[in-house]
Amino acid sequence: MEFPKPRQFRETSLLMYYLDVVFPLQYISPNNNCLGKREWLLTILTSARPTYYATLCLALLYKESLSTSCRSEQTLVWKREKTYYYILALQESQKLLGGLNKTFGITRLKGTVVALACMLQLIGFESSHLSRGDWRVHLLAANTLIPVLAEGWSTALQSGPPATSIWCELDESDFDSIDDQTSLSFEYLGALRFLSNSLAKIGILSCISVGPAAPFEDYGHLLDQPGLIQLEEVLGCKNWAMLTILEVGKLDRWKRQEQEHNRLSLKTLAMRAMIIEDMLTDELQKLPTSETLPDLITHIYAASIATYLHTVVSGLNPNLSEVQDSVCATILLLERLPDLQAVASVTWPLAVTGCMASESHKDFFRSTLRSYEATFSSLKKYDGVLEVLEDAWKKREVDTESPMRWEDLMDHHGLPVLLF
């Protein structure tokens, strides 16, 4: 009888650790009914080397974070193994991405899904406060996959309507097409939906950190795919609010382009901003009176988007009455969150609102973020958000003359913070 080699045993253990511990922290869902419906996940994580290695890398990153200072030898082992798998993941991901253009049809679509899984794992690794790397290169690579993802989803819809939720379960009908090589299996289709939603979430929320260079239209194209993107299920925020973030980002890009050519019309700027503000108002009026957690989270996003919009129009000036009005409105909504765990879904609103907070409101953000950090473990940048806020407040005090932009505030030691 032949047994696997010791390293294979270790890798299997790390993979189980990722599934049991890291994945729930990486993809915290505000809807507990969705938890556990990830039957497609193991297939995708083990289907190609780059995704597999990137997953092991994430597992080791989290193990390293839990090591105490008195166990330095253990920390060194986690760090050594993490670096080993990180290098392998980078090498294999380049091979995978480079080979996609040489494939066609269902093979290319499957390869694209696996490549997206790898890119998202690498983004998760680099953007974590535990590593603080440059996640932008991996997001850029993931964005190039959007056309194939959209085409694949369109093809999948021809076989019938999709499941109502992105958190779907294996059905008896899936066994009828087990040998079908012309369409996506349950596992690949489930991964395509979930990973596309994750890309949309990360991509849209990254726009404020990336600035006008962000591919707003690409993320809008993802949102336009019928039934594909349901951000309420991965973030707790409805699609329309995320679409509005893109619209504000595009307005910011347009304004800067017009300023560069000395042709900015304040009248046109005000009109375009009013259209976006009316969009927010109209959608908020449609929210039901019996508020659910996703409704509250969406309302929080809408209020903070108003702050974002005001600063794009008038500059990053916390002293403006309209800015403070939206900041106060957002804080009142944040105070209605049922528990600290819900903070996981509102990192972006906390950062945007906090950057423009008045002196009297700073302690609210400090206590909220510190309480979350002390209560929950996460791979996300919650401590990074507080550092961003503290830096933003200092910049406001020190430099009141130079015009500040959002990507300047989101910069932390030369690298942008990813708010997701």
Swiss-Prot record:
GO biological process: positive regulation of transcription by RNA polymerase II
InterPro entries: Fun_TF
Origin superkingdom: Eukaryota
Gene Ontology terms: cellular component: nucleus
Keywords: Nucleus
Pfam families: Fungal_trans_2
GO MF entry, a single one: transcription cis-regulatory region binding
Subcellular locations according to the entry: Nucleus
Main subcellular location of this protein, as a coarse class: nucleus
Function: Transcriptional activator of all of the trichothecene biosynthesis genes. Acts upstream of the cluster-encoded transcription factor TRI6 and is necessary for full expression of both the other trichothecene genes and the genes for the primary metabolic pathway that precedes the trichothecene biosynthetic pathway.
Family as reported in the entry's similarity comment: Belongs to the TRI10 transcription regulator family.
Identification of the protein by name: Trichothecene biosynthesis transcription regulator TRI10
UniProt source species: Fusarium sporotrichioides
Organism lineage string: Eukaryota, Fungi, Dikarya, Ascomycota, Pezizomycotina
